Amino acid sequence: MLDINYIRQSPEEVAGMLKKRRQEEDCATLDELLEYDRQRRELVQETDALKALRNKVSKDIAVIKRTGQGSAEDLIREMKEVADRIAGMDETLGEIEKQMESILLSLPNKLHPDVPEGYSAEENHICKDPVAFDHALDFPLMDHLDLGNKLGILDFERGAKISGTGFPVYIGKGARLERALLNFMLDCHTENHGYTEVFPPFMVNEDSLRGTGQWPKFADQVYYMNEDNLYAIPTAEVPVTNLHRNEMLKDEELPISYAAYSACFRREAGSYGKDTRGFLRVHQFNKIEMVKFTRPEESYDALEKILQNAEAILNALRIPYRVLLLCSGDISAGATKCYDIEVWSPAEKKYLEASSCSNFEDYQARRANIRFKPAGSSKPTYVHTLNGSGLATSRLMVSLLENYQTAEGTIVVPEVLRKYTGFDLID
């Protein structure tokens, strides 16, 4: 959530950001917000003046009653009218503040100067040359779906029978390989990268979704359990960031770094017509999430660190990948700057997103009320929050199976995973 003081002082800057994000329609909403803000400030001044008058006259009435000098009836009648006016103005003020909050929750975050301007994913910048590993794929390739079916390690048909399309089933060595990936990534982040492991709930309340920015704007992407008023998490970012909702952190605690495994659930509304084969687009998948809480001046260094931590996983697995800096028309609403890591699918002959690493500055912290007191200061300020996929296994599995396939249709297990799987070949 943006600071209303920043919006009031820099409306042209906010409008420019909305245009860069291709959200010109929100400029009218911005004007509406500024008008509500003007009305609110006027009302606050008026009510404060009336409350000051009421306090003064109440003391005068008390003196008259105590001394018996004169009648206080006229003043009492006048103050009742003032009290009624204050009550009506407070009610109007509450309605205005609700409207302001609704608009503030819907506005996207400001953009970092490094973010390139662009309309869509086609205009994202490749900021790191593709990292390649020689897997000697000089034979007719199978895609991950055919490999999974042939080897009996994936079953999308039975997943569809159980739950519907987009719910995969891992079987035998496929399940073991998935678990190995997750354990390897968690161990790498906690033992090598300094993260504290968290195992969060997979269902959250509305306040948690609001805190990280999925609610209300992206509510249609989230699975909802109406009877219990709970939501299935789209990412561990939601519960882990909300660990510190409504908390005042200590300066010496920062930065805080968490790594969490979770299943992720996404409706993917509006994805019809896109390539939905196999793992390319699913409703349930597994992911390791990295989440950081930092001092404001340290957050962009922390973003680069998160990116390095995610890349370290792919380098250890020897998975080909590239890094993109997202443009203004493709970056998520809450992020000020975001890198995507895409892994190479040799069968699809294209890169697939496997990780997003984002800095939200104080956007989520304002929504979730996460603050700290800087050393030497008595005034609290908001932390900066960051997160990154470290990584999502669905598309990572696509790249792993396809890059590690052999001419015989078997899968060589990456060396770093063998201590977790207990085998080096899937046949």
Swiss-Prot record:
Main location: cytoplasm
Sorted UniProt keywords: Aminoacyl-tRNA synthetase, ATP-binding, Cytoplasm, Ligase, Nucleotide-binding, Protein biosynthesis
GO MF annotations, alphabetized: ATP binding; serine-tRNA ligase activity
Cell membrane is among the record's keywords: no
Presence of keyword Ubl conjugation: no
Source organism superkingdom: Bacteria
A single Gene Ontology CC term: cytoplasm
Biochemical pathway: Aminoacyl-tRNA biosynthesis; selenocysteinyl-tRNA(Sec) biosynthesis; L-seryl-tRNA(Sec) from L-serine and tRNA(Sec): step 1/1
Subcellular location: Cytoplasm
Cited Gene3D superfamilies: Bira Bifunctional Protein, Domain 2, Serine-tRNA synthetase, tRNA binding domain
Recorded catalytic activity of this chain's protein: tRNA(Ser) + L-serine + ATP = L-seryl-tRNA(Ser) + AMP + diphosphate + H(+); tRNA(Sec) + L-serine + ATP = L-seryl-tRNA(Sec) + AMP + diphosphate + H(+)
EC class: ligase
UniProt xrefs under InterPro entries: aa-tRNA-synt_IIb, aa-tRNA-synth_II, aa-tRNA-synth_II/BPL/LPL, Ser-tRNA-ligase_type_1, Ser-tRNA-synth_1_N, SerRS_1_N_sf, SerRS_core, tRNA-bd_arm
PANTHER family with a match to the protein in the record: SERINE--TRNA LIGASE, SERYL-TRNA SYNTHETASE
SUBUNIT field: Homodimer. The tRNA molecule binds across the dimer.
Family: Belongs to the class-II aminoacyl-tRNA synthetase family. Type-1 seryl-tRNA synthetase subfamily.
Function: Catalyzes the attachment of serine to tRNA(Ser). Is also able to aminoacylate tRNA(Sec) with serine, to form the misacylated tRNA L-seryl-tRNA(Sec), which will be further converted into selenocysteinyl-tRNA(Sec).
Identification of the protein by name: Serine--tRNA ligase
Organism, as annotated: Chlorobium phaeobacteroides (strain BS1)
